[in-house]
Amino acid sequence: MKKYIINVISDSAFTVQGHGVHTAYTEHLDGLKKYSPNFEVHTNEKGLKADIVHIHTVGFYGIRFLLSRKCLVFVSAHVVPDSFVGSLVGAKLWYPFAKIYLKWFYNRADGVFAVSQEVADQLKKMKVKSPIYVVPNMLDTEAFASNPKKKAEARKKLKIAKDKFVVVCSGQVQPRKRVDSFLACAKALPGIKFIWVGGIPFKRAAANYNEMQKVMQTAPENVTFTGVIKHEEVIAYYQASDAFFLPSEQETFGIVMIEGASAGLPVLLRDNDQYKITFKDWYLSAHDDKGFIEIIKKLSSDSKYYKMAAQKSSKIAKRYDTKTVMKQINSIYNTDLEKKK
């Protein structure tokens, strides 16, 4: 079997981590090593004579690899212009320039991996002419899987009471994620523990940095913000929890939903059309804080409802498991390599 060389690029390997794009990059690397036997896998290697370069981050570091015309170049579209609003400081001011830059970047690729159908639609509206493939983010779901023993061990390690109902969220602390809704639910349900796994990795470059710092410092007593932590610790928080809740207004995909589902947790999201396409009816949803509160309260008190919700979310884990998604990725790579011969 001929071995092809692939060079996977992400400046998150040596800059800011603790965000979804970095997780997608590391999961892609692991998936290639595990499920792509005809590829020799490298990452961030300058001067490498590769058959394929696959770029995850759209900063200036990726441009030198993007402009390589000696091999196939793929780019994963994790961000669209709307992703920056409510995430980075001053985004509304430089939004038009971001739109021009991203269009230019994606149009230099031989193929663009849109992480959801909504992203694919936005790329078309931006007039991206490169071939667009809807390829979702993936996750090694086995790493997050939980059971009573793992749950007890995680709770002991994290000093969480055995009988406490725990709601977990994961992501950057930023306005777009609707931290305010998370805290409103916690305030209304003081007997339930709420944990936000994540912090502000981009620090003062993040939108509303000072406001978000104040929000964390003045959160109700039943809320914990972990800050940016190691991957192994993130898994422990999922395994110690009872439900996953992300009230975010906008996500290009949201790998954290797969993490929650993989840990066997019911998944609760804000009601929007994007999620209906990506996650079908495999999650619980509400329009507002009142709806979220009612669902969380029911999950904590109704065992039949809880079991039904957990069974629904297990379909998310199965659909977006690394093994499943890598079959699609390998097919795209191999088809385009054959065309290039």
Predicted segments, located by residue:
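Membrane-proximal helix-turn-helix segments that form the acceptor-binding/catalytic region
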Residues: 94-112, 213
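Conserved donor-binding/catalytic core segment of Leloir-type glycosyltransferases
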Residues: 161-177, 183-189, 195-197
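Glycosyltransferase donor-sugar binding loop
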Residues: 170, 193-211
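Nucleotide-activated donor-binding/catalytic signature segment of Leloir-type glycosyltransferases, i.e.
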Residues: 208-232
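Short alpha-helical donor nucleotide-sugar binding micro-motif in glycosyltransferases
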Residues: 228-229, 236-241
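Aromatic "clamp/platform" in nucleotide-sugar-dependent glycosyltransferases that forms part
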Residues: 249
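Short hydrophobic beta-strand element within catalytic cores of glycosyltransferases
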Residues: 262, 266-269
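Conserved acidic donor-binding segment of nucleotide-sugar-dependent glycosyltransferases
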Residues: 281-291, 297-304
